[in-house]
Amino acid sequence: MPSIRLADLAQQLDAQVHGDGDLVITGIASMHSAQPEQITFLSNSRYREQLASCNAGAVVLTEADLPFCKVAALVVENPYFTYARMAQIMDTTPQPAQDIAPSAVISPQATLGEGVSVGANAVIESGVVLGDNVVIGAGCFIGKNTHIGAGSRLWANVSIYHEVVIGQNCLIQSGTVIGADGFGYANDRGNWVKIPQLGSVHIGDRVEIGACTTIDRGALDNTIIGNGVIIDNQCQIAHNVVIGDNTAVAGGVIMAGSLKVGRYCMIGGASVINGHMEICDKVTITGMGMVMRPITEPGLYSSGIPLQPNKMWRKTAALVMNIDGINKRLKAVERKIDKE
């Protein structure tokens, strides 16, 4: 990790320095593991008592928490956001090789922009267009007539099927598959007949997609992922789904076909969302949410029974299974009381 003077780091972060600005910072760490040459952050005042035992050389925090800090500090309004910027400055992610590996297979009919990097054993088919400074990791497959915008990076073993469009400055982690056939079949007297998926996948700018996520191509229209969307690992996005700008999707989410999700939504991990319906803008669904109906009002939504000791859970489940009968008995009692 690169080293930097605390005063220089503060200047880049628009932070106020309190303490020794000449302190050399060599890394970022959590509050419980940070060493004197490292910097940490306090984003929630509930944990300010941890400052007393923290061994970090410096802490990023708010003005309100500064009196509790015994070492150098960078004072900011939003410590967590500042931590994100600080991590970008001190990022240790290896830079890709600025070349095309000899073992890469690139069609003569593909178009590569300036500064494109292609890793070992990658395959780029005819009609592909790669913008400037695109990085294609080792073992990637880029299907015919796919377009990838400038500055986007695919880590190793990403598969992009034919005619997919990916915008600028996107990041796609290893094992992800984009543009595979959607789950489209017709039934003819008990026999399943495959419906070729004639649409594609269009992904906007600044989209980040985690490892081993699958985004299916549309049946007729395109599957669309808006600008600034972030999708975690192992998500399934079915054909013709539309996800609005700046929505966040946590790990293990399943979205059924033709679902439309609005902008600025947050979908909690392991949620399952029915297809052929809409979720409006600014909806938050907590983890393991099961969404069976459209959501038309912004807000926080939850479903399911939180974890309980098994004996208590069995009783709760029994009550839920018998809720209709309990409701009928309650109404009968109410009618009896009304008559009296």
UniProtKB/Swiss-Prot annotation:
The UniProt keyword set, sorted, is:
Acyltransferase, Lipid A biosynthesis, Lipid biosynthesis, Lipid metabolism, Repeat, Transferase
Xref: Gene3D superfamilies = 1.20.5.170, Hexapeptide repeat proteins (2.160.10.10), MurE/MurF, N-terminal domain (3.40.1390.10)
InterPro entries tied to this protein: Hexapep (IPR001451), Hexapep_transf_CS (IPR018357), LpxD (IPR007691), Trimer_LpxA-like_sf (IPR011004), UDP_GlcNAc_AcTrfase_non-rep (IPR020573)
Q: Which GO terms describe its cellular component?
A: membrane
Query: A biological process (GO) annotation for this entry?
Result: lipid A biosynthetic process
Q: In which pathway does it act?
A: Glycolipid biosynthesis; lipid IV(A) biosynthesis; lipid IV(A) from (3R)-3-hydroxytetradecanoyl-[acyl-carrier-protein] and UDP-N-acetyl-alpha-D-glucosamine: step 3/6
GO MF terms on file? Answer: N-acyltransferase activity; UDP-3-O-(R-3-hydroxymyristoyl)-glucosamine N-acyltransferase activity
Q: Which residues form a coiled coil?
A: none
Report the EC number(s), separated by commas if there are several. Answer: 2.3.1.191
Q: Which reaction(s) does its UniProt entry say it catalyses?
A: a UDP-3-O-[(3R)-3-hydroxyacyl]-alpha-D-glucosamine + a (3R)-hydroxyacyl-[ACP] = a UDP-2-N,3-O-bis[(3R)-3-hydroxyacyl]-alpha-D-glucosamine + holo-[ACP] + H(+); UDP-3-O-[(3R)-3-hydroxytetradecanoyl]-alpha-D-glucosamine + (3R)-hydroxytetradecanoyl-[ACP] = UDP-2-N,3-O-bis[(3R)-3-hydroxytetradecanoyl]-alpha-D-glucosamine + holo-[ACP] + H(+)
Pfam short name (any one): LpxD
Active site at: H239 (proton acceptor)
Its annotated function is as follows: Catalyzes the N-acylation of UDP-3-O-(hydroxytetradecanoyl)glucosamine using 3-hydroxytetradecanoyl-ACP as the acyl donor. Is involved in the biosynthesis of lipid A, a phosphorylated glycolipid that anchors the lipopolysaccharide to the outer membrane of the cell.
Subunit note: Homotrimer.
Q: Which family does it belong to?
A: Belongs to the transferase hexapeptide repeat family. LpxD subfamily.
Q: Which PANTHER family match?
A: UDP-3-O-ACYLGLUCOSAMINE N-ACYLTRANSFERASE, UDP-3-O-ACYLGLUCOSAMINE N-ACYLTRANSFERASE 1, MITOCHONDRIAL-RELATED
Could you tell me what this protein is called?
A: UDP-3-O-(3-hydroxymyristoyl)glucosamine N-acyltransferase
Q: What species is this protein from?
A: Yersinia pestis
What lineage is this protein's organism placed in?
Answer: Bacteria, Pseudomonadati, Pseudomonadota, Gammaproteobacteria, Enterobacterales
